[in-house]
C-alpha cells in the first residue's frame, strides 16, 4: 500500500523566502517584457516619430526633470543656507503645538510651514518686471519674446548657466525704456533672483523641498513635478504618514487641494502629468472633474500619450536596474545574490509604488471634497491675466 503523501507542515515552509522568490519572478517578468517591448527597433522608431508632436515632446522633455533637484549636494546645501531656517523651525514649533489634525505628522507640518514661508517671505510674483529707471511696473507693457541669443542684457554663457528658455521684452510707458525679463529655469539661480511666475516658483520651491525632506540616498523619491497642458505647473510630495502623494501649489500657498484648479479657478484642462524620480504618471483623473475635462483626444491621441508614458517608464526601470546592479557589485556577495537583491529593490522602489498609485487614481477613488475655505479664482497674477486664461473662477 502506497503511503499517503504528506503536505509540508507550516513550520517547514519559509514563507518569507517564498514571498521573495515570487517578487523576484514578477520583477524579472516585467523587465523581460520591457526589453522585448521597448528595445526593439520598431518601438524606438515609433517613439522617435511621436516626439514630433508638440504635446508628446513637452511630456518627454520633462521625463528627467527631477534630476535637476537631486544628487548635487552643494546645490542642496546652498538652498538650506539661503532660506531662513530659524524662522521656519520657530513657526514649525508653533504649528506642532496648535495642530489638531492627527493625520499630519512632523514632515507634513514642515512642508506646510515651508509653503507659507516661501509664498509670504521668500519669493515674489511678477506680473510685469520693474522698470530699472523709475522702479515702477504699473505702466509696463509686454512686447513679445526673444531668444536668449538676441538679448542685449544677458550674455549667452550666463543664459546657459541660468537655463533661460526665453526672454520677455517689455516697455515702460513712462520712460520708454525696454525691459528684458528672462524666464529662468535653473533653481539655484532662482535662490538669488527670487522672482517669476509659476515655472520659477515651482522650480525654486522644489529644490528647497528636496533639501528639507528629500533624503540623501538614491532610493528616496518624495518630490514630484506636475505639468498641466493648459500652461500651469505645480508639485506634490510623498507623505510618509498618509502614504500618498499630496498636492502643493507654492504660487497659491495651497496644500492638498487637487480640485483647486477646476472648482476654484474654473479652469478647463486636458492633461495633468506627474514626474517623480522613479516614474511618470497620468494624474488627470486626480485633478480634473468631468465637467471641466477637455477631451484628451481633441488635444493629442490618447494611445500615443499612453505609449510614451509606458515607454519612458520601461526604459527608466531598465536603467535603474543596471544602476542598482552596479551598486550591489560593490558588496561582498555572489553574482546571483546581487541580481536578486537588485530585483527586490526594483520591486519595492518602482513596481509596488507605481501599481499602488495607479489603483488609487481610478476615477471612483479620486473624488475629493473641495475646501470651502479657498477663495474663488486664482490669487497669483493680475485680474486681467487670470481672466484671459479662464482662471478667475467665473467660467
Curated annotation (Swiss-Prot):
Keywords: Cytoplasm, Hydrolase, Metal-binding, Zinc. Its main location: cytoplasm. Residues 386-395 have a biased composition (Basic and acidic residues). It comes from Candida albicans (strain SC5314 / ATCC MYA-2876) (Yeast). Binds 1 zinc ion per subunit. It catalyses: Hydrolysis of an N(4)-(acetyl-beta-D-glucosaminyl)asparagine residue in which the glucosamine residue may be further glycosylated, to yield a (substituted) N-acetyl-beta-D-glucosaminylamine and a peptide containing an aspartate residue. Specifically deglycosylates the denatured form of N-linked glycoproteins in the cytoplasm and assists their proteasome-mediated degradation. Cleaves the beta-aspartyl-glucosamine (GlcNAc) of the glycan and the amide side chain of Asn, converting Asn to Asp. Prefers proteins containing high-mannose over those bearing complex type oligosaccharides. Can recognize misfolded proteins in the endoplasmic reticulum that are exported to the cytosol to be destroyed and deglycosylate them, while it has no activity toward native proteins. Its cofactor is Zn(2+). GO terms for cellular component: cytoplasm. Substrate binds at residue 252. Belongs to the transglutaminase-like superfamily. PNGase family. InterPro entries: Papain-like_cys_pep_sf, PNGase, Rad4/PNGase_transGLS-fold, Transglutaminase-like. The lineage of its organism: Eukaryota, Fungi, Dikarya, Ascomycota, Saccharomycotina. SMART domains: TGc (SM00460). This is Peptide-N(4)-(N-acetyl-beta-glucosaminyl)asparagine amidase. It is an enzyme of class 3 (hydrolase). GO terms for molecular function: metal ion binding; peptide-N4-(N-acetyl-beta-glucosaminyl)asparagine amidase activity. Residues 363-395 are annotated as: Disordered.
Amino acid at each position: 500500500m502506497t503511503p499517503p503523501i504528506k503536505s509540508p507542515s507550516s513550520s517547514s515552509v519559509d514563507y518569507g523566502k517564498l514571498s521573495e522568490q515570487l517578487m523576484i519572478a514578477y520583477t524579472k517578468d516585467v523587465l523581460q517584457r520591457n526589453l522585448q517591448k521597448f528595445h526593439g527597433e520598431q518601438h524606438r522608431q515609433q517613439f522617435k516619430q511621436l516626439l514630433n508632436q508638440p504635446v508628446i515632446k513637452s511630456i518627454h522633455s520633462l521625463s528627467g526633470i527631477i534630476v535637476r533637484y537631486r544628487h548635487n549636494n552643494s546645490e542642496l546645501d546652498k538652498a538650506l543656507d539661503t532660506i531662513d531656517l530659524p524662522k521656519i523651525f520657530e513657526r514649525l514649533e508653533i504649528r506642532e503645538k496648535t495642530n489638531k489634525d492627527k493625520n499630519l505628522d512632523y514632515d507634513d507640518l514642515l512642508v506646510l510651514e515651508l509653503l507659507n514661508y516661501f509664498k509670504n517671505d521668500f519669493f515674489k510674483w511678477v506680473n510685469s518686471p520693474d522698470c530699472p529707471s523709475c522702479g515702477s511696473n504699473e505702466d509696463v507693457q509686454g512686447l513679445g519674446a526673444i531668444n536668449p541669443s538676441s538679448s542685449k542684457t544677458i550674455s549667452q554663457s550666463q543664459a546657459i548657466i541660468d537655463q533661460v528658455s526665453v526672454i520677455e521684452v517689455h516697455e515702460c510707458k513712462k520712460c520708454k525704456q525696454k525691459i528684458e525679463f528672462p524666464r529662468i529655469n535653473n533653481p539655484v539661480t532662482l535662490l538669488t533672483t527670487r522672482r517669476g511666475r509659476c515655472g520659477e516658483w515651482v522650480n525654486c520651491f522644489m529644490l528647497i523641498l528636496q533639501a528639507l525632506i528629500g533624503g540623501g540616498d538614491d532610493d528616496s523619491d518624495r518630490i514630484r513635478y506636475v505639468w498641466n497642458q493648459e500652461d500651469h505647473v505645480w508639485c506634490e510630495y510623498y507623505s510618509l504618514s498618509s502614504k500618498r502623494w499630496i498636492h502643493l501649489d507654492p504660487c497659491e500657498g495651497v496644500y492638498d487641494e487637487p480640485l483647486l484648479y477646476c472648482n476654484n479657478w474654473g479652469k478647463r484642462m486636458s492633461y495633468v502629468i506627474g514626474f517623480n524620480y522613479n516614474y511618470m504618471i497620468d494624474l488627470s483623473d486626480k485633478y480634473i472633474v468631468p465637467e471641466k475635462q477637455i477631451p484628451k483626444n481633441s488635444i493629442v491621441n490618447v494611445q500615443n500619450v499612453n505609449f510614451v508614458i509606458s515607454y519612458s517608464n520601461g526604459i527608466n526601470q531598465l536603467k535603474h536596474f543596471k544602476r542598482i546592479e552596479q551598486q550591489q557589485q560593490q558588496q561582498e556577495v555572489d553574482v546571483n545574490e546581487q541580481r536578486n537583491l537588485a530585483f527586490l529593490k526594483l520591486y519595492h522602489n518602482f513596481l509596488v509604488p507605481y501599481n499602488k498609485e495607479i489603483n488609487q487614481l481610478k476615477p471612483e477613488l479620486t473624488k475629493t471634497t473641495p475646501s470651502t475655505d479657498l477663495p474663488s479664482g486664482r490669487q497669483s497674477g493680475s485680474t486681467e491675466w487670470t481672466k484671459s486664461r479662464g482662471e478667475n473662477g467665473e467660467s
